[in-house]
Amino acid sequence: MKILKLPLALTLMLVLSAFVNAATPSLNIGDTVIKMPLAEDVSIDDAITSMKLRANNLNFKLVAYLPLYKELQSMGVKSKRIEIFQFCDARIAKAMIDFNPDFSAYLPCRITLLEGPDGQATLITMNLGMFIESANLPPDLLKQAIHVRDTIQSIMQAGADGDL
């Protein structure tokens, strides 16, 4: 009798494992971001200036800046440029947090400038559209979230195009 129980238990464990794995959606990290390479004639410094100008024109404040590559270089680690820019409209951020404090984990909006091994730079941000769709926001907050998404993409596009 014990011989039958072991295979049955093992079979049940395998079936349960397969069910759990099938029921758990996998998330490809690449699907959660938007990437925009800089145009060939756009320097990294011009891209940064363009993003800052566009953000200012759209009333989004640059609330934080992290030149990660400088920190790495100060530790003796070779690094191409890795710079993280954080933009925010404080009023919208507060409204989102008031609705659901979990949104605070996604604030402020971040754009990373990443210089590749070939010197080509890319701007990368979280795909806000992916999260907006699943957030079950009331209509007024949905409108504001879409505005944030569009503004961040506009800031990125200005940087990618060198739109001074």
Residue spans for each PLM region:
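Positively charged n-region of N-terminal signal peptides that target proteins for export
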Residues: 1-5
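Surface-exposed, polar helix/loop patches in the mature regions of secreted/periplasmic/lumenal proteins
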Residues: 85-140
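N-terminal secretory signal peptides
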Residues: 23-85
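Short, intrinsically disordered, mixed-charge
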Residues: 53-57, 98, 102, 157
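Bacterial N-terminal signal peptides
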Residues: 7-18
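Short C-terminal domain-edge/linker segments immediately following a structured domain
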Residues: 66-67, 94-95, 114-119, 142-146, ...
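C-terminal partner/receptor-binding element of secreted or periplasmic proteins
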Residues: 128-164
